Every structure is written in structure tokens, then in C-alpha cells.
Amino acid sequence: MKSGVPLLLSNVSWGVAMSVQAAILGRLGASGIAASSIAQTLFQCTSVIAYATGDAARVMTGMAVGEGDMKKVKSGAKTMQLMFLIIGVLTSLVLFLVRKPIISVYNASVETAEFANIFVLILCVTAIGTAYEMPCLTGIVSGGGDTNFVFFNDIVFMWCIVLPLSALSAFYFKFPPAVTFALLKADQILKCFVAIVKVNRFKWVRVLTR
């Protein structure tokens, strides 16, 4: 129960954060909002495997930890990290290759199409980070039992870094839409540095079963 509460709170926090992000995106103008929708939809379609690996990593790590086999836990974590990076690179490549044909299908204005192309290029970079940090933290670390860290990490990056900087970009400095969009996705890269250190120290292993 104790390990499940942080995950629940993390999901609630994420839901609220999405509403705040929507308000920030609303400052990008009609073309920016439409372009963001196109880019996000395309990203979600190409990153299904990356998100699925997070669930698989959580189950596999939880089973290994439950068995008390630290050798298996460590070798599994290292193998999965390599797999996450490969999936990220492939996802980024697919996203890059299909962006123009897919964007052209939409009945969008020239400005919207240009914004969408820029946003997708930004996502091509962050996709690699997402494919690595997300399954590492919500999969391996969470599956290992350290759900408190995952919750704390999400709170810090989303509410203390990404949303404040994005809000300043959109409302105060009025930076170009691409800058605001990039800031909204910046945590996907920044979290990678945390994930690398956290996962490979193996201090996240918690035996939750008796």
C-alpha cells in the first residue's frame, strides 16, 4: 500500500500538470496549438513501444527483486538500459522520416505546418530521452520498489523546472512557440542524467514481498 501511494500521487500530479501545460500551449496562438496537437499525435503513435517497455521493465524488475537475485537485477537493468536507448534512437528515426508525409495529410495552413515540423524535430530529440528515462524511472526504479523517488523526481522536474520556465517563456518573455514547446519537453532530456545515476547505483532495490 505504501509503495502504491506515491504512484497514485504521481499520476494525479501528472494529470494536473497536463492541464497547466494546456494553458501554456494556449498562449502559442491558433497555429501553435494546432501544430502542437499534430506533433503530439504523431509522437504518441511512434512511441507506443517505448511506453510499453516501461510496463515490461517494471514487471521484470519486480520479479527479479522478489527473487532476491541481485546479480539478475543488475544484469537485467544494464541490458534493459541498452534496449531503451536502441528503441529511442529507432523511434526518433521513424519520427524524423515520417514527419513531412504525415503533416502534409493534415489540412493545415503553411504556418501551422511549419510549426508542426519544428515541433516534431524537437520531439525527435526528446524521444530518445523519453525512451530511456521513462522506463528507467517508472519501470526499473519503480519496479524495484523505490516509488517515493519516482514521485519526488516528477514533482521537482515538472513543477519546479518545466512548468515555471515554460510559463515565463509564454507569458512573460513571449518567446517564439518553438522555445516554449522545447521547454515543455526539456525534462525528458534532463531526467536522463538522474536516471543514469539512480539506476546504476542500485540503491532503489526494495523487497516489497514477504
Task: Write out the residue ranges for each language-model feature.
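Short alpha-helical transmembrane segments in multi-pass integral membrane proteins
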Residues: 1-5, 61-127, 169-210
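Helix-terminus/linker motif at the lipid-water interface of multi-pass membrane proteins
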Residues: 12-45, 63-67, 101-110, 172
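Small-residue-rich hydrophobic transmembrane alpha-helices
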Residues: 22, 35-99, 131-150
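Transmembrane alpha-helix boundary and packing residues in multipass membrane permease domains
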Residues: 7, 11, 19, 23, ...
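Hydrophobic positions within alpha-helical transmembrane segments of bacterial inner-membrane proteins
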Residues: 12, 16, 88-96, 131, ...
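Short runs within selected transmembrane alpha-helices of multi-pass transporters and secretion channels
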Residues: 50-54, 123-143, 149-158, 165, ...
